[in-house]
A protein has these predicted regions:
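Extracellular loop and loop/strand-boundary signature of outer-membrane beta-barrel proteins
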Residues: 35-38, 97-101, 128-133, 143-147, ...
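Residue-level signature of outer-membrane beta-barrel architecture
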Residues: 54-56, 117, 148-150, 206, ...
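Cleavable N-terminal export/targeting peptides
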Residues: 1-28, 178-184
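Transmembrane beta-strands of outer-membrane beta-barrel pores
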Residues: 33-37, 68-72, 129-135, 148-150, ...
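Outer membrane beta-barrel transmembrane domains
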Residues: 83-101, 219-221, 227-256, 277-288, ...
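Hydrophobic, lipid-facing positions within transmembrane beta-strands of outer-membrane proteins
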Residues: 46-50, 109-113, 140-144, 158, ...
């Protein structure tokens, strides 16, 4: 069947996701500003970002990005109703627990780079490094991925990748935390903890026809070290406030499915599904659907929905009369059983061949009575 000109364009976009060669590479600068606001003015995030992608000949592509965000607001933590102004100075016996929004501010900066190297066979090796830093958390991640073309027509590829993350957790105030030792001489923290994350993923991508593509992958990850949140408290025996304690190991695995389809000359969609499970008894399902409508040669509209659901961790409870002498205990709602829905809209405006503008608005609702709005505006310049 012969495709019209617009379908050829959509087919090219679809194929370029699979055919990661310099023929389809772009040199560009992307600048965005993201604003995130939770309901009841709980948490607000302002995050400007910049990304640069540069192709060096036919064998190398470099990508560099920088994000800096300012976070402010309050997070619900169990504190003593009489003396509790923070997570730490509320800890002890004979307390009167109350869940209170404790205010905080944070400045966070993260940077990443990746380098794609293409071999004579046009197989690809991608090496990437990212670093994220804030006053009490320092994350460093190194990853490598190998992509192999199954045949000369390049309609199928296999990839295998691995990453290692080293996280430094700086606990600033441990006056009431018996686990804390002498202050860290470099950071000034009361205690310096670390955690390690090792992840692997294996996948296959298949170009079905000129308008559709499918990708499937499986993943496995292990975490060890300090996996608790130093600011979260747990109520034991109804009147004792102590630091939460999570296991120091975590093993997770699952799979991802992706399907991309150009239905008509102006309508295309991306379907994603993710299954995740771990030995903390958390199992989650994620369904993500994004649809795009090309209104004309300059304007593309986007709309989508993301649904997420998970079961609760084996050591989680929301009740203050639940925990006694259990080894592991947490009141963190992120470990609870919940579901969430995100509604997404976007507009992309192509001002010229080299310059385009974008704006998107996402509405997030979670069954734990949390809701938020994401707004992103920016531009992309091809050079």
């Amino acid at each position: 069947m012969q495709l019209n000109q617009k379908q050829f364009k959509l087919s090219f976009v679809t194929a370029s996701i699979l055919l990661a060669s310099s023929v389809y590479a772009q040199d560009y600068v992307r600048v965005n500003y993201m604003q995130y606001d939770e309901n009841d003015n709980r948490v607000s995030v302002k995050a400007p970002s910049i990304e640069v992608n540069k192709d060096f000949g036919v064998d190398y592509t470099l990508n560099v990005s920088l994000v800096t965000d300012a976070v402010s607001g309050a997070t619900p933590i169990y504190v003593d109703s009489i003396s509790g102004a923070s997570a730490f100075n509320s800890r002890g016996d004979n307390k009167t627990p109350i869940k209170k929004n404790v205010e905080f501010t944070e400045q966070r900066t993260s940077a990443s780079f990746s380098l794609v190297s293409r071999l004579d066979s046009r197989d690809e090796i991608t090496v990437a490094f990212s670093k994220s830093y804030e006053s009490d958390y320092d994350a460093n991640t190194l990853s490598i991925d190998y992509l192999h073309w199954a045949n000369k027509s390049k309609n199928r590829s296999y990839n295998i990748g691995a990453s290692y993350a080293l996280n430094n957790i700086l606990i600033k105030d441990c006056s009431y935390n018996a686990q804390c030792g002498a202050p860290d001489s470099v950071s000034g923290a009361s205690k310096k903890e670390i955690s390690n994350i090792l992840s692997t993923e294996v996948g296959v991508t298949q170009l079905i026809d000129k308008t559709s593509l499918v990708k499937a992958s499986i993943f496995y990850s292990t975490e060890d070290g300090y996996l608790s949140n130093p600011y979260y408290n747990v109520v034991r025996y109804t009147n004792k406030i102590v630091a939460e304690v999570r296991p120091d190991k975590r093993v997770a695995y699952g799979f991802n499915l992706k399907y991309i389809k150009a239905f008509t000359s102006t309508i295309s969609s991306k379907f994603k599904y993710k299954f995740y499970t771990d030995d903390w008894d958390i199992t989650s399902h994620t369904i993500d659907i994004n649809n795009y409508y090309e209104l004309n040669s300059k304007v593309t509209l986007g709309f989508g929905i993301r649904y997420y659901t998970q079961s609760e961790a084996i050591f989680y409870s929301k009740d203050t009369n639940y925990f006694t002498d259990e080894v592991y205990a947490s009141h963190d709602d992120r470990l609870s059983s919940f579901n969430s829905t995100t509604l997404k809209t976007s507009v992309d405006y192509k001002y010229s061949k080299s310059l385009s503008y974008n704006i998107s608005l996402d509405k997030y609702d979670q069954s734990t009575d949390l809701s938020a709005m994401y707004t992103t505006v920016g531009f992309k310049y091809k050079f």
